[in-house]
Curated annotation (Swiss-Prot):
GO MF annotation terms: DNA binding
Gene Ontology terms describing biological process: regulation of DNA-templated transcription
Chief subcellular location: cytoplasm
InterPro entries the record matches: Integrase-like_N (IPR017856), TACO1_YebC-like_2nd/3rd_dom (IPR048300), TACO1_YebC_N (IPR049083), Transcrip_reg_TACO1-like (IPR002876), Transcrip_reg_TACO1-like_dom3 (IPR026564), YebC-like (IPR029072)
Gene Ontology CC terms, in alphabetical order: cytosol
Keyword annotations of the record: Cytoplasm, DNA-binding, Transcription, Transcription regulation
NCBIfam families named among the record's database cross-references: PRK00110.1, PRK12378.1, YebC/PmpR family DNA-binding transcriptional regulator
Name by which UniProt lists this protein: Probable transcriptional regulatory protein Tgr7_2237
Coiled coil: none
Family: Belongs to the TACO1 family.
Compartments, as annotated in UniProt: Cytoplasm
Length: 249
């Protein structure tokens, strides 16, 4: 599975923990607010907002909270104006890292991001230093044991770019971002609702991480992901099974 990283699986577990302490809601509200501000409050004409709202509802956010966030973004209610900033850099072992943030204070945010990189042996780079390594994709994930033939049939007919099967039997449907909503709707309508789905940035080529670099790299990714202003962390790091086993030993 090209570009598949165990960091993605780690993030999914972290998201569950974040949800328990309310941090996930904060991220989702920011995304809804900014999406509504940039593209308007109509879900039918604003795919970014529709995706953000779907994610919020999937996380059991109340419709009232969602509606207030949309109104704040559309200027119908007072609220904080967030600015989107992407930071790029290199982590231990030379792996590429992109950090998407939403902030009301860019000086605070860049200081916190730079501190995390420096503390963990990485380097904050310039705009464009690693972005070329990543591609925006829609991803729908299914657990091992799912009906591979049926998923492949429906996905490709709906316009998916690829269907990839992992070594563990898990399945990923890859789409162009513009086709993501249509593919997801077709899969759900066919009774094939994904276990996890998102529009994300995927590296074209993975960078294997050795056992020496792995602890400090994971610490850096965790530090970045835990920052209040950080929405998403992307990396081309690939943690081989033997490295993860060594870390868990």
């Amino acid at each position: 599975m090209a570009g598949h990283s165990k960091w993605a699986n780690i993030q999914h577990r972290k998201n569950a923990q974040d949800a328990k302490r309310g941090k996930l809601f904060t991220k989702l509200i920011k995304e809804i607010t900014v999406a509504a501000r940039m593209g308007g409050s109509d879900l039918n004409s604003n795919p970014r907002l529709r995706l953000a709202v779907d994610k919020a509802l999937d996380a059991n956010m109340t419709k009232d909270t969602v509606e207030r966030a949309i109104k704040r973004g559309a200027g119908e209610l007072e609220g904080v104006n967030y600015e989107e900033i992407r930071y790029e850099g290199y982590g231990p072992g030379g792996v590429a890292i992109m950090v998407d943030t939403m902030t009301d204070n860019r000086n605070r945010t860049v200081a916190e991001v730079r501190h995390a990189f420096t503390k963990c042996g990485g380097n904050l780079g310039t705009d464009g230093s690693v972005a070329y390594l990543f591609e925006k994709q829609g991803v729908l994930s299914y657990p091992a044991g799912s009906d591979e033939d049926r998923i492949m049939e429906v996905a490709l007919e709906a316009g998916a770019e690829d269907v990839a099967v992992g070594d563990d039997g898990s399945i990923e449907v890859i789409t162009n971002p513009d086709d993501y909503e249509a593919v997801r709707a077709a899969m759900t309508e066919a009774g094939l609702k994904p276990e996890h789905n998102e529009v994300t940035m995927r590296a074209g080529t993975a960078a294997p991480v050795d056992v020496e670099s792995a602890p400090s790299l994971l610490k850096l990714l965790d530090m970045l992901d835990d920052l209040d202003d950080v929405q998403n962390v992307y990396t081309n790091a690939d943690f081989p099974d033997e490295v993860m086993q060594a870390l868990e030993a």
